[in-house]
Design a protein with these regions (language model features):
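Sec-dependent signal peptide recognition
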Residues: 2-10
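A residue-level marker of the well-folded mature domains of exported/periplasmic proteins
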Residues: 20-353
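Hydrophobic core
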Residues: 13-17
Length: 353
């Protein structure tokens, strides 16, 4: 009987009909559904991972740190072997990730670097410093700062994102590296004097918080189409830009006299604002590109090989340099959004109606 069973197993193996190994489980933890870009990131990644044969556990944490921690704990309990995490607070996950490391689970920090945890194996993001320099250089060009003098300065205010998001160091840092020389020469002037990261931060990247701060600046500085001159507002991303735009519209600005407002993510409301002349530009980070890159990293980890990496010097999370892959950002504006967003299939024309 034993010989018969052995022969049957051997035959199954020879014909390729032996039972398949269990599929690798991948946990994907996104911060919130309230921002369009995280919905797209999560859905694109889940689609790509499922297509590659993985079991995907996609969770959104409603911008609640305790909820994200609990969701990751549940992923570990269910046997997820690889975690892809876009953190709410980059410094709040050390405890649960210590558990992941003990269980041999590999962690990929997604777009936001997870800080102070040696459980982070890799980081996948866009070149976030370049995002800031793109925004800064756009302002230099559109405000004609290289041909101005301090007798005819351009006037600007500054907004960046949440102080618990490590990325603002790169977004805001890149932009300010470009713009600081013009501020020092007096060619560019911030009337409020609020130019430090702490002064310009927006908790949770909140549209409402950005709108309230912009309204306060408008009141304090008497900005308006018939008031004190305001040429531009630097915004690190679109959710802040939307709040800024709301406040400027409320102050009476129209497409004919709207200050130059920057952004990031090419979210639908911001693209519509660009078309309407109420936002100048937004840095485009194609989530399909990043999702595909993460799938390659997950594949390599699952196969025990080295994931593709193109940066080993930039991102130190407090425990050492995290091997990273940086995708390339570009900017969209009213002149190129059709080729960038519609022709590429990222959006349909109906999405932007």
């Amino acid at each position: 009987m034993k010989k018969i069973i052995s022969a049957a197993v051997a035959a199954l193996m020879l014909t390729g009909a032996v039972f398949a190994a269990p599929k690798v489980r991948v946990g994907v933890s996104m911060p919130t559904k309230s921002l369009q870009r995280w919905n797209q990131d999560g859905n694109n990644m889940a689609k790509e991972l499922k297509k590659a044969g993985y079991v995907v556990d996609l969770q959104y944490a409603n911008n609640d740190i305790a909820m994200q921690t609990q969701q990751i704990e549940n992923m570990l309990t269910k046997g997820d072997k690889i975690l892809v995490i876009a953190s709410i607070d980059g410094s709040a996950l050390k405890g649960v990730l210590d558990t992941a490391k003990k269980q041999g689970v590999k962690v990929i920090a997604y777009d936001r670097l997870i800080m102070n945890s040696d459980a982070v194996s890799y980081y996948a993001t866009f070149d976030n410093y370049k995002v800031g320099t793109i925004q800064g250089n756009y302002l230099v060009e559109k405000l004609k700062l290289n041909s101005r003098t301090n007798k005819d300065p351009a006037y600007i205010e500054f907004f960046t994102g949440s102080p618990d998001d490590n990325n603002i160091n790169f977004f805001f840092g890149g932009a300010m590296d470009v713009l600081t020389p013009y501020l020092k020469s007096g060619v560019l002037v911030c009337r409020s004097g609020q130019t430090s990261k702490a002064q310009c931060a927006t908790l949770n990247w909140s549209t409402e918080a950005a709108q309230k701060r912009m309204e306060n600046l408008i009141t304090a500085q008497k900005y308006g189409p018939n008031g004190t001159k305001l040429d531009a507002v630097y915004s690190s991303n679109d959710s802040c830009a939307n709040g800024i735009t709301n406040a400027l519209v409320g102050a009476g600005y129209t497409a004919k006299n709207f200050p130059i407002v920057t952004g990031q993510d090419c979210d639908k409301p911001s693209v519509k604002n660009m078309i309407a002349g109420l936002q100048a530009m937004s840095v485009f980070k194609d989530t399909r590109t990043l999702a595909s890159q993460v799938v390659k990293m997950v594949d390599a980890i699952a196969k025990g090989t080295q994931p593709p990496i193109n940066d080993k010097k930039t991102y130190d999370n407090g425990t050492g340099i995290i091997p990273s892959f940086l995708c390339e950002p570009v900017y969209g504006d009213k002149d190129n959004y059709k080729a960038l967003l519609l022709d590429s299939g990222y959006y349909t024309a109906a999405d932007l109606q």
